[in-house]
């Protein structure tokens, strides 16, 4: 095992949060090392690249929307329901518009082109949209609806990748050092203080490094769409890493843990989220809970680990929201214009995770006509299934 030189700050995890922490530390004059078990980006790079921001951002104003920190707070406190302190929510709302300015300084780009319809994700014609429950009952009773979903300007589903690359470029331009394929397995603790980390890494000169990168890229794409195949490809990459990884350690004045969740850890899912074991994971294989466990090993506290979510969005096309969602008993699930995750949670909690959307012929025809203008290719594929074999038709509700 070789002992590396010390850094002011070591960050474990190089997604959007880790990159932001690295940038702030570098701006403060710190010497920064970032370790990531992948090649950087994490779930942030796979995401839609949407930042939730409000309180009067330039892009809200460009779209003719009125918002304020108080209005944003009145909405968000309904969403978090006490799981985040009022003080933290208030601070987030008050600094939200400033966050967009900060992101733009790092290279992120936004537009005030507002999507005029409810959608799970906007097309390339729109980069601002109602990304939550802002317009839905009962949320709109306490806060004036305002669109706050700011999507990074990029083509199709590349917004998340473009968003992270802007942060990566900014961090590396400020002198932040990055060591990929590095798995931290222990924190170095002396006299009750964390003073470094121990990790294994596959160095750039290691045999099979380029093949590992190719396999990881394929596994990352398949892991969310066809998990069994993605797992097999990842197993090959994992074998390469295990055969070539070497032990290292590094000391630091401060250690920041910035890893993902645990959706790719079957044991943790079974322990904390019974009933979700068979849900297809959304994220990367790095979301295995290892960084959470590192924090716990140093005395960190965790809470709400049982709060896993599974989604079924009903739009686009937006006309589908004019239908009625019902559970197996025929009872209505909830108002259809709720955010997809919110509506799905009610369906899980009260209807066993099963539901149906009932439409008449007029809504069906209207929705079909909206497919071309309201969908990106991945949404179009789902609509193609729905409008071909993914539905049942009858003259009456009785069938």
Where does each model-flagged region fall?
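N-terminal Rossmann-like FAD-binding beta1-loop-alpha1 element of flavoenzymes
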Residues: 9-34
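Conserved Rossmann-like nucleotide-cofactor binding loop
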Residues: 17, 40, 331
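Glycine-rich FAD pyrophosphate-binding loop
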Residues: 27-48
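A short alpha-helix-loop-beta-strand transition element characteristic
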Residues: 44, 83-88, 107-119, 301-309, ...
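Glycine-rich active-site loop/strand segments that organize a redox cofactor
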Residues: 52-92
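Conserved redox-cofactor binding core of oxidoreductases
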Residues: 93-246, 266-267
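Glycine-rich loop(s) and the adjacent beta-strand/alpha-helix scaffold that form part
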Residues: 158, 205-313
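An anion/pyrophosphate-binding glycine-rich loop and adjacent beta-alpha core
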Residues: 292, 301-399
């Amino acid at each position: 095992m070789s002992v590396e030189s010390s850094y002011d700050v070591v960050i474990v995890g190089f997604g959007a949060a880790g990159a932001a922490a690295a940038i702030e530390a570098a701006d403060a004059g710190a010497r920064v090392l970032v370790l990531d078990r992948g090649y950087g980006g994490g779930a942030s790079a796979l995401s839609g690249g949407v930042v939730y921001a409000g309180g009067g951002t330039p892009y809200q104003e460009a779209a003719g929307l009125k918002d304020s920190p108080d209005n944003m707070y009145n909405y968000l406190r309904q969403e978090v329901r006490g799981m985040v302190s009022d003080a933290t929510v208030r601070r987030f709302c008050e600094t939200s518009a400033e966050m967009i300015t900060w992101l733009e300084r790092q290279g992120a780009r936004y537009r005030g082109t507002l999507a005029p319809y409810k959608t799970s994700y906007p097309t390339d014609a729109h980069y601002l949209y109602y990304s939550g429950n802002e317009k839905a009952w009962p949320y709109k009773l306490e806060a004036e609806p305002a669109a706050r979903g700011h999507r990074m300007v990029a083509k199709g589903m590349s917004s998340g990748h473009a968003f992270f690359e802007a942060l990566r470029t900014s961090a590396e331009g400020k002198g932040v050092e990055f060591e990929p394929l590095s798995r931290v397995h222990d924190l170095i603790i002396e006299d009750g203080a964390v003073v470094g980390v121990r990790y294994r890494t596959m160095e750039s000169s290691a045999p099979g490094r380029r093949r590992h990168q190719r396999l990881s890229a394929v596994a990352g794409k398949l892991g969310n769409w066809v998990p069994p195949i993605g797992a097999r490809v990842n197993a090959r990459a994992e074998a390469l890493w295990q055969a070539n990884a070497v032990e290292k350690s590094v000391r630091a004045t401060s250690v920041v843990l910035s890893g993902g969740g645990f959706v790719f850890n079957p044991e943790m899912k079974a322990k904390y989220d019974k009933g979700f074991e068979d849900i297809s994971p959304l994220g990367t294989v790095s979301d295995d809970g290892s960084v959470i466990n590192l924090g716990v090993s140093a005395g960190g506290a965790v809470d709400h680990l049982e709060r896993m979510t599974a989604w079924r969005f009903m739009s686009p096309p937006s006309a589908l929201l004019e239908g009625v969602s019902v559970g197996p008993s025929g009872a209505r699930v909830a108002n259809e214009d709720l955010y997809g995750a919110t509506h799905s949670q009610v369906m899980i909690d009260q209807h066993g995770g099963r539901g149906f959307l009932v439409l008449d012929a007029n809504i069906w025809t209207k929705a079909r006509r909206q497919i071309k203008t309201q969908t990106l290719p991945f949404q179009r594929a789902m609509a193609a299934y729905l409008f071909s074999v993914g539905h049942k038709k009858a003259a009456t509700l009785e069938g």
